[in-house]
Amino acid sequence: MDDLPLELLQSLDHKKENHAFRSLKTFEGVDFFSNDYLGFAREELIHEKALEKLHTFPFNLNGSTGSRLLSGNHKAYTELEQTLCETFEVEAALVYNSGFSANMGWISAIIQKSDLVLYDALCHASIRDGLKMSPAKSYKFKHNDLSDLKNKYEQLKKHKNVYLITESVFSVDGDFAPLDELKVFCETHQIRMIVDCAHSAGIYPYNYKQYFLSIVTFGKSYGVHGATLLCSQNIKDYLVNHSRSLIYTTALDPFTIYKIQAAIELSRSVKAEKLRVKLSECISHFLKIAEDLNLMAYLLNSNSAIQGINCKDNAQAIDLQNYLQQHKFALAAIRYPTVAKGEERIRVVLHAFNTKDEIKRLLEAIHSYFQS
């Protein structure tokens, strides 16, 4: 079998030299790095309810057998999308295989050459890659900076259609977008606003129908897999006809769809509300202990479940990751080029199932590292 071209092999060597080489690993220890915010991924009820429904499915138990526009659009999809409309109080929902394919799919289909896109500088890679596939002009504005957004718009506003893309909770920094202020700005200038709610859906309530389009993923707080776009029926109809990442891929299997259905139903329960309260308490406890240990200078400015320990470079981020793993904590370093140079960090994700003792021991280990 032929090997990679020399220049590509050299690029791997360059990554190794700069502590940026990635490899697939398994991690053991207390979970402080998964996106399973509410613990739904370990919730047996979701699996049991999905399996019960699967046993009533008439055929194709193992796979969807095709694209949603061919044989893959089984009845479980119809039931789920109706549930999503009721849960999120929107006119239409369109399920995709992942959040990445959802963002790639709507951006490449809807955004046209004569359009303008303004997006937050910290938007997810799926949004950036979607914009690369679009012929439109796209410009980033400084993270959560309304002043810079307004300046960019004033310089570039001579376009028929303008779109603004942001996230509700940002996946790396963990901070919240000023959605109310952004919405006022968009309404004033007739800009279509899109919000990626991957890291907030299921935890924080939003008025989804006020946006042109919202993205909700099921692999975070819902603990399963897949994603949905929340939108108008006209947008859904257009995407069914033009979104290539929907049209030309095998649909999700019935069991996966039933697990999403069960997770959405669980998210509306009293049990889920108690888990959201527990998660909020874990966040408060984390910040209090960090302050007690004089660690606030090392922390990101975040009040969400996504926290972070700032490091000076890739090498220190890897070193701290290994140190914490030796202390039986499962965390991962976020390195350049995923983040800018000088912004490397250990990403700490808090969950409703983390105990106060686990949080305290984690922060004590971090304190010990920086004191050594």
Language-model segments: which ranges?
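PLP-dependent enzyme catalytic core of the Aspartate aminotransferase-like
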Residues: D2, R42-L51, A76, Q82, ...
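Conserved PLP-anchoring active-site segment centered on the Schiff-base-forming lysine
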Residues: W106-A125, C282
